[in-house]
Design a protein with these regions (language model features):
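Juxta-kinase regulatory segment immediately upstream of eukaryotic protein kinase catalytic domains
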Residues: 1-48
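An alpha-helical support segment within catalytic cores of ATP-dependent transferases
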Residues: 27-36, 143-203, 214-215, 257
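A conserved alpha-helical element in kinase catalytic cores
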Residues: 30-33, 55-57, 66-111, 115-138, ...
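Active-site acidic catalytic loop and adjacent metal/ATP-binding pocket
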Residues: 48-64, 100, 187-233
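Conserved, surface-exposed functional patches that form binding/active-site neighborhoods
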Residues: 130-150, 231
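Active-site Asp-x-Gly
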Residues: 213-258, 265
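ATP/Mg2+ or Mg2+-diphosphate-binding catalytic cores
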Residues: 251, 279-301
Length: 301
């Protein structure tokens, strides 16, 4: 039986889930320790540490059969689990995405292979060539066919709508200017999603915090919020990472396009303009007025 102090949700984690899913998630939070105990027994793992974001709770575990480090991920939304499980299965041919060991989407549960050393790229220097290798792997190793009947994956337009919907809901004291800016940016993003010349499996949340350093320095993607649509979408965070001028954005998109076959520099640039206000929204709500925040807010025109 896992230590209840480990599996009981602390107040900040519970607050994030409430903000994302609403009061209906309370019952799930209360039942989490019992659910984790059942999953740990079923999958033969021992939870050692806990963490998580706004949609799930994750537990670093030791697999009893071989002492291997694995991760148990549990979400109150079965759709989120089903989407991630399908995407990870779709990328099973590549070592550049965390491996799926077991899944129970109906219970919102996934068991994921560990990544060693597993250091997040966020806050570290990164090489464009390494990021390009990751983007190439995601584009080339995913499914060749569009999702069929019964697939959990939804079009990229749905992901875009969800992201902007959450941002608009959180705009709050930013007032009408923020809402107008976000609605204009959402229209641009939806137009891009609809006009993609080709479609593939999209990670959907490929920022530096969701990329780890794996064996031999290989970059490994984790925590997809996947969709089916324009694969250029996944390059946007890397095109904008550390960038605060139009010239630097042009240079970065051209550099990535030169390293990733099929990546369209003009479309990545357009995605950056459409998503800049979305990426800047948290900093703007916090009252930041630095050069990068102003640059991102200004991308939408």
């Amino acid at each position: 039986m896992p230590d209840p102090r480990l599996t009981t949700l602390p107040a900040p984690a519970r607050a994030r889930l409430l903000a994302r899913f609403g009061p209906a998630v309370d019952a799930w939070c209360e039942a989490l320790p019992e659910q984790v105990a059942e999953l740990a027994e079923r999958w033969g793992v021992e939870p050692l540490a806990a963490g998580g974001g706004g949609t799930s709770r994750v537990f670093r575990c030791r697999r009893r059969v071989d002492e291997r480090a694995v991760w148990l991920k549990v979400t109150p939304d079965p759709q989120v689990a089903a989407e991630e499980a399908e995407a990870l299965a779709g990328w099973e041919r590549t070592a550049s995405v965390a491996g799926l060991l077991a899944a129970d989407p109906g219970a919102g549960a996934l068991l994921l292979d560990g990544v060693e050393p597993g250091t997040p790229v966020r806050g570290q220097e990164w090489e464009p060539a390494q990021v390009a290798a990751l983007l190439r792997e995601l584009r080339e190793s995913g499914p060749d066919q569009a999702p069929g009947e019964g697939s959990a994956l939804r079009p990229l337009a749905h992901r875009v709508g969800l992201l902007f919907g959450l941002a608009l809901r959180r705009a709050g004291p930013d007032g009408p200017d923020a809402e107008i800016r976000l609605r204009r940016a959402r229209a641009q993003a939806l137009e891009l999603a609809a006009s993609a010349p080709g479609a593939g499996l999209v990670h959907g949340d490929l920022h530096a915090a969701n990329v780890l350093r794996g064996p031999g320095g290989r970059l490994v993607a984790i925590d997809p919020r996947p969709a089916w649509g324009d694969p250029d979408f996944d390059a946007v965070d890397w095109a904008l990472e550390g960038v605060s001028t139009p010239e630097a954005l042009r240079e970065r998109t051209a550099l990535l396009a030169g390293l990733v076959p099929g990546l369209d520099a003009d479309r990545v640039h357009a995605w950056a303009h459409a998503l800049g206000a979305l990426l800047a929204a948290p900093a703007a709500r916090a009252g930041h007025d630095d050069a990068r925040t102003r640059f991102l807010l200004g991308l939408g025109g």
